[in-house]
Amino acid sequence: MAVSPTTMAAVRASGAVPNAEFLLSAEGVRKEFPGVVALDDVQFRLKRASVHALMGENGAGKSTLMKILAGIYTPDKGDIRLKGVEIQLKSPLDALENGIAMIHQELNLMPFMTVAENIWIRREPKNRFGFIDHGVMHSMTEELFARLNIDIDPDIEVRHLSVANRQMVEIAKAVSYNSDVLIMDEPTSALTEREVEHLFRIIRDLRSQGIGIVYITHKMNELFEIADEFSVFRDGRYIGTHASTDVTRDDIIRMMVGREITQMFPKEEVPIGEIVLSVKDLCLKGVFRNVSFEVRAGEILGVAGLVGSGRSNVAETLFGVTPPSSGTVELFGKPVTISSPTEAIRHQMAFLTEDRKDTGCLLILDILENMQIAVLQDKFVKGGFVQQGALEATCEDMAKRLRVKTPNLYERVENLSGGNQQKVLIGRWLLTHPKILILDEPTRGIDVGAKAEIHRLVTEMARNGVAVIMISSEMPEVLGMSDRIMVMHEGLVTGFLNRDEATQIKVMELAAR
């Protein structure tokens, strides 16, 4: 029977360690979200005083499991045990009270509060009058930093810190809860090489103090440098656990990508035409650099890479969302400067963003209102009046062509499935008759049937001469749909693969360089 967080906290405080072969373990865990099985009967076992890396492609289920262990999600099935005792974690506070702390990739500090205030928020020491004792809080922070070999002024506001130092503050905050378990999600994604070395020194110190560390990463070199053992997840399933000294880089890649490509991604051979888009030495300071590539009419250029590779940033820069620091862009052989999405649309570019709910669909509006956004002013307004009949007929035809499942165009988009929402967005851009279509994670979060429909539409656009740039974290999709694949790692293009030579292992080798 699972014990309450309060009871487990008492067990932890007493020092009792029943059946503590593992510091933290999960067995038979399942977690579903609408239309998606994120975790299917997975297991995980963390030893005391060890660093345990979690590996897997994007969407493998790593972060979902860690959010369960941190009390952010509750599992639909399965057992979580802390020092051998089954527990139920219903909130992050439950996890913290039981010594489990998660350091998120995004970092969750208050920028206008001091370092000390961030660390001790809601736990501030009080003087005899009930007011916060800033002197004591400063001393507590200095003692904590001394333990971790962190050199940061406790009284400086967080907004003045570098990303690396903010991360150090997050780690110190987690340790301040007397945590037995620290969960780190891609902790080096924004750090320089020297900052990574400092982080690893702190991790080794924490390990020597008996703390168990869960380390989510995509980077092979980090696994071999800092992890004692690792587990691989794939498609929401547990694949295996090994000591990091017992395997090679190729072994891990095979575990991560060990599945065959299905016929769900048939690639139709279409004539490849002239160069439509040419990018030369494109840079965005601190994000990506010297990105160069070409894409031709009728070609699907797949873009692969792991979290932090800069793929989406390149797409946003091409579409005018963020101006580049340097570099050149040519359309049909002529140099262009695209400083806004409006200019990009005028140049017959279209961009399907990776997050349809935040930067794509206007969920509270209906299908018609969503589809017309990019074309209303230019094509359906004459003499100051909207040609409503022509607009509705055009959008109706597009919805039928895309097989959007809806009773009518006045259905609110929030009521549609993820796949149909994506079709509405594609319809919006098809109405602009683009010559260049940039797709960022076009099938993320939609079911298998809807994915096949999206792939059909992408193939149709290529057949009609559109130059397609398709960013995807799904390896079968990249391999199954692309004529060529450009691979990125940490803001750099690490290589190109033609369709006939591309394999999952070759892509992963380039992506993890």
Curated annotation (Swiss-Prot):
Transmembrane region(s): none
Residues reported in the UniProt entry to bind ATP: 56-63
InterPro entries named among the record's database cross-references: AAA+_ATPase, ABC_carbohydrate_import_ATPase, ABC_transporter-like_ATP-bd, ABC_transporter-like_CS, P-loop_NTPase
Keyword annotations of the record: ATP-binding, Cell inner membrane, Cell membrane, Membrane, Nucleotide-binding, Repeat, Sugar transport, Translocase, Transport
Keyword Cell inner membrane belongs to the record: yes
Topological relation to the membrane, as annotated: Peripheral membrane protein
Chain's role: Part of an ABC transporter complex involved in carbohydrate import. Could be involved in ribose, galactose and/or methyl galactoside import. Responsible for energy coupling to the transport system.
Protein name: Putative ribose/galactose/methyl galactoside import ATP-binding protein 2
Organism phylogeny: Bacteria, Pseudomonadati, Pseudomonadota, Alphaproteobacteria, Hyphomicrobiales
